[in-house]
Amino acid sequence: VAQVLPAAPSPFPRPRRIGAMSSFKMPETPVIVAGGFGGPAVMFTVTPFRNGLTLGATNSAAGFMELYGQVFAKGFRGGWTGGIYPATAACPQFLCLGPAYHFYASFAGVAGGVFLTSVTETAIVYGAETCNAQMAKNQKSPGSIKNVHPSWKPYGPGFGIHVFRNIIATAGLRMFCTPCTWLIEKASGKSNALTTLGGDFAGNVCAACLSAPVHQLYNFTVTTPELGSLGMSEQKERMIQFLKDQYLETKDGRTRLSAVVPRDLFMRSMYVAVAYTMYSSLERALVANWPR
């Protein structure tokens, strides 16, 4: 008779059942620690990358080096202008990306967890990110935005765009990394910490590239105050025109992707892929090494 080995211990306690239709699992301590403390540190670290993207939304002519130069135009510390607001919001934001995602996924599945996490994340960080974007705009062009969006206000222009962007980014963290890791392991013939890190980064780069135009549309929306005085149809036309101006060019009667496309894909990857890969690596390390 074959011996039945005990199952490997789960990182989560036994599911608590509510009625007969659903169950959920509460995340363990290291996942909560990663979200509560690691998230703010990660989001503050990548502030210059986020500010560079913001400036790029209203400057399609500048290359990424020029945009990063503008970010640091007032000194090294100036690169972190407004970063305290997303960093503060990152505590509940990454509690959402980590513990809340695992909670949602335990009863709604991976796709449902990604959607619910993204909506919750937007409700938490929309105000802080919008405030940060407008402060970055004002640093480059003082007085451009007279009434900066309050960091505590969880709604405003571009809210739905923000949710859509987060769905793509969260999918990268929770859905794209595993197949990317598998491909790297198959190609290299190895499975170790480096292949896992590479898979995480590749998955997050994929999501960053897919979400880049959505993120820039959000930045355009929140740093263009005159949109608020336009009707819905006019706003839609301006947004479509922004995407065309940003990513398409016509030359010799032919329309093609503009040089801004690789710039924005690179800058979005530097922001999102670096931040989420740092976070996923920290979360994994804490779960593996936390005292039992």
Where are these regions (language model features)?
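Alpha-helical transmembrane segments of multi-pass membrane proteins
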Residues: 41-54
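Hydrophobic transmembrane alpha-helices of multi-pass solute transporters/permeases
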Residues: 47-48, 91, 95, 268
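The first (N-terminal) embedded transmembrane alpha-helix
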Residues: 35-42, 87-95
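Flexible extramembrane linkers and terminal tails adjacent to transmembrane helices
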Residues: 1-38, 53-68, 76, 96-165, ...
